[in-house]
């Protein structure tokens, strides 16, 4: 690869990193909550569930219907009177008109309506918990990608520094060769190393672009690619394992949803039992009717009536073939199944919490060790670089120290963000991820 082309490519890339917008964690969360497609969807579901809890959807209000009708007929008829006289009515027209308003109201339905309405309220709470879980998952996904971008930014900077050192080494090797102080081999080795560093830098640059696009997707495509993320992180003070475990059993969103499902099923049992009781209804209506005809045989040419009517009705299914009994039994069995599911979930949740806690502690310790390893690698590189400049170390030893330092930096960066993501996974399990400052 032409060294001039490499330098131009790296320069252009470096210029692209200057003065870019900083996307802070708080801003990323704000953008995700406002624009993420999944969160928008669940917010709509919450609105629907809230609408379902309205008194208009409760069954407590009466129904009022209006009816109207009209008819027309034209007939030929013949009638014989008592005195033997016969009369005919040809083309006699009859018109009928009617209108009514009808009221129906259920006074008592065995309390089924009450328990159904309570179900709607609990289902609304369940939908809110489902929305919360979606938001928690989105926040975890957001920061998994966010910190991947941060890691790649730090990796790119580290590789850029390595490239700059290799560039300086190549310049030195070329000068030394020009003045007869070294062989052409040293210059060629330096050129090979700078080629490798440039390839690593371009790959890191491409990965960074890809992950920025992934991050932008989670944010609802609200940003362009010219942004940086905050690489300064702090870890939460998660010292008391038992206290956090208790919070997990109280606030884990999936466990809370199971509790709501159990509550809903208990209401279903009560609602199904309402089938054992009678239903009492109230009816009322106001009607108007008019009939007119021009038949000479008719005693009344026009008749109009209007008035109110009302009544009570009672229905009691003394035996419905056993369907109510079957539904009640099945609802009780479903309640047992849900409680078994909850017991299993709690055991699984405790296991997942312990795994997440140990994983977090392990990764946090690895990060701290890698921080110490950086100091050792940096010290080793500084010494080797000084010897190399004095001619007391060869290019192979210098390159190895350079690679060791770069690998230590890349490993430290990975350990740093792995520990942070592990912390967020632990907070997600415990139901605390929305209560911490990012």
Question: Residue locations for each model-derived region?
Answer:
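Sec/SRP-type N-terminal targeting helices
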Residues: 40-44, 57-58, 93, 107-135, ...
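Bacterial Sec-dependent N-terminal signal peptides
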Residues: 1-26, 36, 438
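Short flexible linkers and secondary-structure junctions
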Residues: 20-148, 280, 284, 325
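Periplasmic alpha-helical coiled-coil/stalk elements that build and connect Gram-negative outer-membrane
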Residues: 51, 134-249, 359, 363, ...
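Acidic, low-complexity, intrinsically disordered peripheral segments
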Residues: 29, 411-438
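Bacterial Sec-pathway N-terminal export signals of envelope proteins
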Residues: 19-69, 181-183, 223-263, 317-318, ...
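Small/polar, glycine/serine/threonine/aspartate-rich low-complexity segments that form flexible
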Residues: 67-105, 230-237, 270, 283-316, ...
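A short glycine-centered flexible hinge/capping loop motif at secondary-structure junctions
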Residues: 177-181, 388-392, 429
């Amino acid at each position: 690869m032409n060294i001039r082309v490499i330098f131009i490519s790296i320069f252009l890339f470096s210029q692209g990193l200057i003065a870019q917008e900083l996307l802070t964690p708080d801003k990323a969360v704000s953008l995700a909550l406002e624009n993420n497609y999944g969160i928008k969807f669940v917010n709509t579901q919450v609105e629907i569930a809230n609408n379902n809890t309205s008194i208009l959807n409760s069954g407590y209000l009466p129904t009022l219907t209006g009816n109207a009708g009209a008819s027309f007929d034209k007939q030929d008829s013949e009638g014989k009177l008592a005195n033997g006289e016969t009369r005919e009515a040809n083309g006699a027209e009859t018109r009928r008109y009617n209108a009514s308003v009808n009221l129906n109201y259920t006074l008592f339905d065995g309390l089924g309506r009450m328990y159904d309405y309570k179900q709607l309220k609990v289902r609304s709470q369940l939908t809110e918990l489902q929305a919360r879980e979606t938001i928690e998952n989105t926040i975890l996904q957001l920061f998994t990608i966010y910190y991947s971008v941060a890691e790649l930014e730090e990796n790119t900077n580290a590789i850029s520094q390595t490239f700059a050192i290799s560039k300086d080494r190549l310049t030195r090797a070329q000068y030394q060769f020009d003045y007869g102080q070294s062989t052409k081999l040293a210059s060629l080795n330096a050129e090979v190393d700078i080629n490798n560093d440039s390839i690593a830098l371009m790959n890191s640059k491409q990965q960074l672009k890809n992950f920025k696009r992934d991050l932008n997707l989670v944010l609802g495509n609200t940003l362009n690619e010219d942004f940086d993320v905050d690489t300064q992180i702090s870890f939460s003070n998660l010292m008391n394992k038992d206290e956090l475990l208790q919070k997990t059993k109280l606030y884990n969103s999936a466990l809370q949803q199971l509790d709501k499902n159990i509550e809903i099923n208990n209401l279903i049992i009560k609602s199904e039992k309402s089938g054992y009781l009678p239903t009492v209804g109230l009816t009322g209506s106001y009607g108007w009717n008019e009939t007119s005809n021009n038949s000479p045989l008719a005693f009344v040419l026009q008749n109009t009536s209007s008035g109110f009517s009302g009544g009570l009705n009672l229905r009691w299914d003394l035996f419905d073939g056993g369907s109510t009994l079957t539904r009640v039994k099945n609802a009780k069995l479903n309640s047992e199944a849900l409680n078994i599911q909850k017991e299993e979930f709690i055991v699984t949740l405790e296991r997942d919490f312990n795994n997440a806690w140990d994983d977090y502690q392990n990764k946090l310790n690895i990060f701290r060790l890698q921080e110490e390893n950086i100091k050792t690698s940096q010290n080793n590189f500084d010494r080797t670089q000084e010897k190399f400049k004095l001619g007391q170390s060869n290019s192979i030893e210098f390159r190895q120290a350079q690679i060791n330092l770069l690998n230590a930096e890349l490993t430290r960066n990975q350990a740093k963000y792995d520990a942070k993501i592990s912390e967020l996974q632990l907070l997600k399990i415990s139901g605390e991820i929305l209560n911490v400052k990012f």
